[in-house]
Every structure is written in C-alpha cells, then in structure tokens.
Amino acid sequence: MILRLIAALVLIYAFGFLGFAFTLPAPAPKTDTDAVVVLTGGPGRIARGLEVVERGLAQEMFVSGVDPEVKPAEFAEQFEVPARLMNCCVTLGQLAVDTRSNAGEVTQWLKDKEFTSVRLVTTDWHMARAYSEMSSALPAGTRVLKDAVASSPDLATLFLEYNKLLAAEVSQGMPKGQSIEEIEEVDADDTPATGAGGAA
C-alpha cells in the first residue's frame, strides 16, 4: 500500500515536471497595461521592458531586484536607456533579493502608483513561480499579462526551478491566484523582439 502511494506520488511529480518543462510560456502580444514590471536575473528581461515602454504599451517600467549599489545613471549607461525615458518612466526597485520579495516590492509600487494592470517580464522558465508569488501579493482585481523572455534552459535549470515552484506553492498554502486576473493574449503574432540585456 505504501509502495503504491509512493509510486503514485512519483508519477504525479514526473508528469508535473514534464508539463512544466514542455509548456514554458511565450512572449506576450501587443497589449496595453498601466505598467511593465521586470524582475532582474536573466538576459533580455530589461531590454524587453524598455521596448514595451518605448512602444507605448505601458506608461512606466519598474525594475525589481536591482543591486542597491547601482545608481540610476549607472543603470542607464549599462542598458543604454535614453535620458528622457529614464527620467519619466523608469523606477529602480532595490529592496528585493528573491522572487518572493520581488512580489512584495512590486506590490507596494503598484499600490503607490494606483496601477491596476501590469505586464510581468521574466524568463520563460521563471514565469510560473513569479506569477505564483505575484498572485499571493498583488491586490485583488489586479490584471497581469505574462510576457516571457524566451530562453534555452538546460535540464538542471528546469529541475531546480520546478522544485522551487512546488516549494513556493506549498509555503503559500497551495496555488493561489484567484484574486488577480490573467490578461488573455489576443494577438500572438505581434510580439516584441527578444532583444539583448540582462540582470542588473
């Protein structure tokens, strides 16, 4: 009986991992939101966020998880952000140290700005956990558009991330997200270019 239970759990875990690994999210279509939020930690993320703002798909950009020692001018130079864009539309969040604190930092910024819709930018393999953490922190009614930066993760990266996702959901009391609304992707052919860039 115990062996059957263990075998069943192993199968559930294995199928869950396969589903996670083979259904990574895609870049989002041309859809307007109040803001775009970028979580640092992977190439292409910041470039994607900047492109979204420059195309007028979001009013402002918040970069969560920037090193506290990085000054706005240094950030602008590293990522080639035009001064006009940096001054009007880019805010650096420098308190977060992991995905959960990203969610807290983003939530506070959105509340301060009174924004109710946001484009979430992170790497494709990280999106599920990032969205899970956001769903537990964001105010009810917040609309979220997942905008994944495509990557080519190896098996080790996927395995580690899947286990982090499970741990995050267990610590939250199992998957949440009913309080926020995922924005439907309606124009899959019109996606921003991946671009270059990386974590701050």
Residues covered by each model-derived region:
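A transmembrane-helix-recognition feature enriched in membrane-embedded lipid enzymes
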Residues: 157-181
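A general structural signal for short secondary-structure boundary/capping elements
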Residues: 66, 81-87, 164-171, 189-194
